[in-house]
């Protein structure tokens, strides 16, 4: 049995292609310990000056202490997981703000990464990540969502990353059906190898 953290970030609820794919993965991984964090249904606070002070580990005010406690909770969930499932739809060529905010709260010096003489080093090594990406159009792997997710996960030490794409969903119902079927086939392959 494995610990799995599922991050949903779509604002579209049950209509979301990435949420539907995340639910499909959850169904396939029954029997594991699964924690689901829906960043749209359970929004994180806006990452502002108080949050930046808090995640540096220097909280002084009550608000900053609460933000540090939130960051600690998010990091604990992440540290406990062996596998991370992330729903990452493309909104205006990038990830949703909810997902960006999540990484702002968990990317903490000396906790999830550290600076060394050779540059930054991620501290959350040995984890797997499966990214569920949905795009209205057709994009190659150089798109911003893929590049950002590879970069931020690598920054915190997660380098075993696989991508599942549902592309062209903006082309209509037939395209959605085809994209979902293709994505589910890829998910089946990945889950079988876990």
UniProtKB/Swiss-Prot annotation:
Gene3D superfamilies attached to this UniProt entry: 3.40.50.360
Enzyme Commission (EC) number: 1.6.5.-, 1.7.1.17
Disulfide pairings: none
Obligatory cofactor(s): FMN
InterPro entries: Flavodoxin_fold, Flavoprotein-like_sf, FMN-dep_NADH:Q_OxRdtase_AzoR1, NADH:quinone_OxRdtase_FMN_depd
UniProt keyword annotations, A-Z: Flavoprotein, FMN, NAD, Oxidoreductase
Keyword Transit peptide: no
Enzyme class: oxidoreductase
Catalytic activity: 2 a quinone + NADH + H(+) = 2 a 1,4-benzosemiquinone + NAD(+); N,N-dimethyl-1,4-phenylenediamine + anthranilate + 2 NAD(+) = 2-(4-dimethylaminophenyl)diazenylbenzoate + 2 NADH + 2 H(+)
Ligand binding (FMN): 10, 90-93
SUPFAM superfamilies in the record: Flavoproteins (SSF52218)
Subunit structure of this chain's protein: Homodimer.
Family that this chain belongs to: Belongs to the azoreductase type 1 family.
Protein name (database record): FMN-dependent NADH:quinone oxidoreductase
Upper lineage: Bacteria, Pseudomonadati, Pseudomonadota, Gammaproteobacteria, Pasteurellales
